[in-house]
From Swiss-Prot:
Enzyme class label: transferase
Species in which this protein is naturally found: Polaromonas naphthalenivorans (strain CJ2)
Taxonomic lineage of the native organism: Bacteria, Pseudomonadati, Pseudomonadota, Betaproteobacteria, Burkholderiales
EC number annotated for this UniProt entry: 2.7.1.39
Name of the featured protein: Homoserine kinase
CDD domains, per database record: HomoserineK_II
Length: 316
């Protein structure tokens, strides 16, 4: 979360009254994240998150907001977008697309145990199954096509060694994506950004997934790879903790067992997840946008993760 577009107390208060959410009592800009403008807002009726979308368009956003509605109706704990009197859940504020969702209970678990990882794995599998009948379609906007467009943009900022790594991995991922095995992988709506800070826990129990604004239609295995690369690693080295990874995968497979092809391609899709976030962090770091409270992530972290996945693939 970040603040690119400043919203005053009075502007937020009027917007929340329009949505029948009561009187604004407090508003606070959210410093984490790098994509959208986010404010935590408290009213006399509850606590909410106000988001102004800085890159996603009015045409793209219904996919994300209605996906959250769809998942919520199927028992997945996710933020619920607030509708206006006409039933619209996508709004406009200061000329930008905007949405308000309820704030989930609890806190992020930034030092997860195997038990936390198991909870995330089980809920991710439930999410994948719950989304199978979601009718809206939208590609993963940070997928292979974006990688091929963006690698040439960041190449001038890299060392020779980094260029070799990023070009080699891009070629490998293009090769994997063209294979018959990859095309046979189960797919549907995925979260695509389910990091430790996008999950809430309360008293050890998982209370919700949030920040669905990188979601899209892609392979479930890619979503799994992204989670393993964050929930189940040592953050300093990027090294995988197999105890946490095994707990995550065992819990996931109690709900949706992996196919034989998924088991084979898991190392490749873990590499894909590391590559995606290394590339996007390079892009954000070297080509930043103006924003209050913006804290770009260190690109080096996911470079280390990618190198670890290359050196020590995780096999089921």
């Amino acid at each position: 979360m970040a603040v690119f577009t400043e919203v005053s107390f009075d502007e937020a208060a009027a917007f929340l009254r329009f949505l029948n959410l009561g009187q604004l009592q407090n508003i606070k800009g959210a410093a984490g994240g790098i994509e959208n403008t986010n404010y935590f807002v408290d009213t006399d009726q509850g606590q909410y998150v106000l988001t102004l979308f800085e890159r996603l368009t009015f045409e793209q956003l219904p996919f994300y907001l209605h996906l959250m509605k769809h998942l919520a109706t199927r028992g997945i704990p996710v933020p619920d977008p607030v509708a206006d009197a006409k039933g619209n859940i996508l709004h406009r504020l200061k000329g930008k697309p905007a949405a308000v969702v309820n704030k989930l209970r609890g806190h992020s678990e930034l030092a997860p145990t195997p038990l936390h990882c198991a909870g995330v794995g089980e809920m991710l599998a439930r999410l994948h199954l719950a989304g199978l009948d979601y009718e809206r379609q939208q590609p993963n906007l940070r997928g292979l096509a974006w990688w091929n467009e963006t690698v040439p943009v960041v190449l001038p900022y890299l060392t020779e060694e980094q260029r070799s790594l990023i070009l080699g991995e891009l070629a490998y991922q293009n090769h994997i994506a063209a294979s018959s095995g990859y095309r046979s992988l189960p797919r549907g709506a995925i979260h695509a950004d389910l990091f430790r800070d996008n999950v809430m826990f309360e008293n050890g129990q998982l209370t919700g997934f949030f920040d669905f604004y990188f979601a899209g239609c892609d392979t479930f295995l890619y979503d799994i790879g992204i989670c393993l690369n964050d929930w189940c690693i040592d953050l300093e080295s990027g090294r995988l903790d197999t105890t946490r990874a095994d707990a995550f995968m065992a819990a996931y497979q109690t709900v949706r067992p992996l196919t034989a092809q998924e088991r084979t391609l898991l190392p490749a899709l873990q590499r894909a997840g590391a590559f995606r976030f290394w590339l996007s962090r390079l892009w954000d770091f070297h080509l930043p946008r103006d924003a209050a409270m913006l804290k770009p992530h260190d690109p080096g972290h996911f470079e280390r993760v990618l190198r670890e996945r290359l050196a020590h693939p995780y096999l089921l």
